[in-house]
């Protein structure tokens, strides 16, 4: 029986997705799979945007941000009748293997294809938010972190010149990993993340102490899951006398050349994904834990909120920000 494997990217784009597409295609070909690409994620599967993927298609993309397969969100895919159409579009081409690169929403769609239609699916975690359970790191997190650090350095220049307190809102959805790591690596002076209580009075007290100790500017990292940074700015104004500004980094965090770490991680995850499918396993995601490649059921990845033990890192960030 001929083995045919399709690749799609879904949800928000993340640096490293192209490296994962490239490695998946190359390794799948090595194992004897005929490789197909699906444009625009599940929307493209539904609209039959499925095409044979040649080696030329993945040539020269390892260092490119975004995704050459494009990505989109599909509300229709949440309905069983549309998922059946999408699955049939695969089956009529003889495709029974699928690698899905994306976040938890992408995993839910993949798990339904596996459960309802028997499509042999493996997920690769691609999201800058680092909010997928079953893996220490997701594709794009490291690159995004470095983008934030670069922005912090520039913002610190103006904060220092004007003796200001600047709040920087970063992405992450419900997870504070980006803000936490950026605070530690970038020498942040305060942090607010959704996993921990964030009383404005505590932050204000910390900033006042910095002023007493002769510090004349502050950089505070605010994870988007905490709330609107402008609201936080207004509340903080009632507690401290220094001039406050807010910066929302926004979609610059999604783009850029993927870091070496993300390219290697993408390649390792892709190799594991194809290896798993070649062995006849499916319905799982691949991840990295303690530098080892692992798999976990997609169902588990979809149903469990990622709750890492972040207390020690949070305490470290607070200690270093004094």
Curated annotation (Swiss-Prot):
Active site, per annotation: 129
GO molecular function, one term: fructose-6-phosphate binding
Residues binding substrate: 127-129, 164, 171-173, 224, 245, 251-254
Entry binding sites for ADP: 22-26, 156, 187-189, 215-217
Key words of the record: Allosteric enzyme, ATP-binding, Cytoplasm, Glycolysis, Kinase, Magnesium, Metal-binding, Nucleotide-binding, Transferase
Listed EC numbers: 2.7.1.11
Catalytic reactions on record: beta-D-fructose 6-phosphate + ATP = beta-D-fructose 1,6-bisphosphate + ADP + H(+)
UniProt: ATP binding residues: 12, 73-74, 103-106
Entries under Pfam families matching the protein: PFK
Cofactor(s) annotated in UniProt: Mg(2+)
Keyword Transferase: yes
Description of activity control: Allosterically activated by ADP and other diphosphonucleosides, and allosterically inhibited by phosphoenolpyruvate.
GO cellular component, one term: 6-phosphofructokinase complex
Binding-site positions, Mg(2+): 104
GO biological process: canonical glycolysis; fructose 1,6-bisphosphate metabolic process; fructose 6-phosphate metabolic process
Record-linked SUPFAM superfamilies: Phosphofructokinase
Compartments, record wording: Cytoplasm
Biological pathway: Carbohydrate degradation; glycolysis; D-glyceraldehyde 3-phosphate and glycerone phosphate from D-glucose: step 3/4
Source taxon at top rank: Bacteria
Chain's role: Catalyzes the phosphorylation of D-fructose 6-phosphate to fructose 1,6-bisphosphate by ATP, the first committing step of glycolysis.
Matches recorded under PANTHER family: ATP-DEPENDENT 6-PHOSPHOFRUCTOKINASE, PHOSPHOFRUCTOKINASE
Membership in a protein family: Belongs to the phosphofructokinase type A (PFKA) family. ATP-dependent PFK group I subfamily. Prokaryotic clade 'B1' sub-subfamily.
Record text on subunit structure and interactions: Homotetramer.
UniProt name for this protein: ATP-dependent 6-phosphofructokinase
Gene: pfkA
